[in-house]
Amino acid sequence: MKTQIQAIHAREILDSRGNPTVEVDVTLECGAMGRASVPSGASTGAHEAVELRDKDTQRYSGKGVLKAVSNVNTEILESLRGMNAIDQEQIDHLMIKLDGTSDKSRLGGNAILGVSLAVARAAASALNLPLFQYLGGEQAARMPVPMFNILNGGVHANWQGPDFQEFMIAPTGAGSFKEALRWGSEVYHELKAVLKDAGYSTAVGDEGGFAPALKKNSDAIELIIKAIERAGYTPGSQIEIAIDPASSGFYENGLYHLRSEGRKVDAQELINLYSSWVDKYPIAVLEDGLAEDDWSGWKLLNAALGDRIELVGDDLFVTNVERIQRGITENVANAVLIKPNQIGTLTETKAAIEMAYGANWGAMVSHRSGETVDSSIADLTVAMGTGHLKTGAPCRGERVEKYNQFLRIEEDLGSRAFYAGHDAFVR
């Protein structure tokens, strides 16, 4: 079978926020084709791979991606044509070398990732394998706990509600992914009713979660617990809570600005707040509890809570093995958030997950707030057996597409599928 790359074609499409992004088609000599599209974040880490934008204010307010598209259709195509799509690492490393920068700013992380994912899809198609099996082999059968972001704050809610960006539920007590998805959907709809009864807006944010104008951060947790109970489930044993404050967004001059509560706190005071919540509420996961470069604060946070809950670094690590290695050495967390577009290739994404595993850390795959209907992260999650992922609320097509892909994968696996459940998190 001829799995050499014959053609690569990129185009500018729109993401879920109506902003341009890159879609790539890779065609092999055997006729197999793979298509992938690239997401975009709202709260981005300062150390992420560069998303190449045109900065032409006459088009899409400067957010066009025609330069990235052109880079795929010329330079990248010329370099990769004739290469074997099955040689994923070789292809990814060639693109990194071709770019020549540390942050993929010349060709664009969005251009490179689109090609990287489309190559994997084309190779899987040529071999007549589902993507998760192509990436993970026969043993890939662990279904993840879905972390549903059902209540939004921070930048995802235009700072109209809680300071903390995401309040999630994790149905760890379910027996399968299919059951977990149902539980999540039921709680989501109960939360809508709870908010309506309390006189709050039920408009949804970028990731499908509700964005009510709450006065206190803890109100979000109280409302979610009420919704869990109203849906007929037990907080803690059946459904746990996860929080992503995205703290870099409210960190300034060494202090954390809790706008909704009208106060500024230092790292230790914020850690004390988290500790009191972990005592009071069934919280299993805290992501980006402190700012991306507050390394000393993260050490204190891990000392306080690292043996009780999963502490995930997102902006702190940006899926970058050098930063993850520093985190492991300095003992600042116990898990890594994995976003392929933060680093820019499938090979580097897998390396980040493997590094986390090597340190007995957890890895949680994640979407971005500006998504597409590409479901590659669902296949990646099962392929790598990460046991949990977050891809928004059970609402909005670009979020639901990932959840529906897990249903297909679980069905495909049949009796071999097993649900991560309570073992999903490091604690």
From Swiss-Prot:
The active site is at 207 (proton donor), 339 (proton acceptor). Its cofactor is Mg(2+). One of its GO terms (biological process) is glycolytic process. Its EC number is 4.2.1.11. Transmembrane segments: none annotated. Mg(2+) binds at residues 244, 287, 314. (2R)-2-phosphoglycerate binds at residues 165, 339, 368-369, 390. It is an enzyme of class 4 (lyase). Component of the RNA degradosome, a multiprotein complex involved in RNA processing and mRNA degradation. This is Enolase 2. The lineage of its organism: Bacteria, Pseudomonadati, Pseudomonadota, Gammaproteobacteria, Pseudomonadales. The gene is eno2.
